[in-house]
């Protein structure tokens, strides 16, 4: 089921998600609905806050991206595509390398792209849909997507990385989104 997407300036986007404590069929259904919603809106990541839920849950799928990603599981290289989609459930991150600038968009900010400083690599502890912990390290575009979604789970938005001057430069775009005048891109249907 396609869920209603929450756009900027909805207050839920500023809420830190509550930990997930039930790894049941409801969680599995929600994850499936979030994946369908993310695909419908042509995204690579979607946090629970973006569908109006105050949870520590995000879904990511970078398998269709042309941008380079890397993944280490148990310290060994793994094929990124084989581990997509990826679920972040009650995640914690450790940032492992220097920063680089990433040009990012966000489903909650239709049409807006900004440059954001991100760590080149992240170490992640998360849980699978059965509640089992697992650990991995990500680099490249996957690392960026994870950091972007993790920020959502903390109530932080990518515009928070902008200076006051940079925010002033995009003020009209933000006002358009608030007024509902921004156009969302959706998946073509047959």
From Swiss-Prot:
<dbReference type="GO" id="GO:0042586">
    <property type="term" value="F:peptide deformylase activity"/>
</dbReference>
<feature type="active site">
    <location>
        <position position="149"/>
    </location>
</feature>
<comment type="function">
    <text>Removes the formyl group from the N-terminal Met of newly synthesized proteins. Requires at least a dipeptide for an efficient rate of reaction. N-terminal L-methionine is a prerequisite for activity but the enzyme has broad specificity at other positions.</text>
</comment>
<dbReference type="GO" id="GO:0006412">
    <property type="term" value="P:translation"/>
</dbReference>
<feature type="binding site">
    <location>
        <position position="106"/>
    </location>
    <ligand>
        <name>Fe cation</name>
    </ligand>
</feature>
<keyword id="KW-0479">Metal-binding</keyword>
<comment type="similarity">
    <text>Belongs to the polypeptide deformylase family.</text>
</comment>
<protein>
    <recommendedName>
        <fullName>Peptide deformylase</fullName>
        <ecNumber>3.5.1.88</ecNumber>
    </recommendedName>
</protein>
<keyword id="KW-0408">Iron</keyword>
<keyword id="KW-0378">Hydrolase</keyword>
<feature type="binding site">
    <location>
        <position position="152"/>
    </location>
    <ligand>
        <name>Fe cation</name>
    </ligand>
</feature>
<keyword id="KW-0648">Protein biosynthesis</keyword>
<dbReference type="InterPro" id="IPR036821">
    <property type="entry name" value="Peptide_deformylase_sf"/>
</dbReference>
<dbReference type="InterPro" id="IPR023635">
    <property type="entry name" value="Peptide_deformylase"/>
</dbReference>
<dbReference type="GO" id="GO:0043686">
    <property type="term" value="P:co-translational protein modification"/>
</dbReference>
<dbReference type="Pfam" id="PF01327">
    <property type="entry name" value="Pep_deformylase"/>
</dbReference>
<feature type="binding site">
    <location>
        <position position="148"/>
    </location>
    <ligand>
        <name>Fe cation</name>
    </ligand>
</feature>
<dbReference type="GO" id="GO:0046872">
    <property type="term" value="F:metal ion binding"/>
</dbReference>
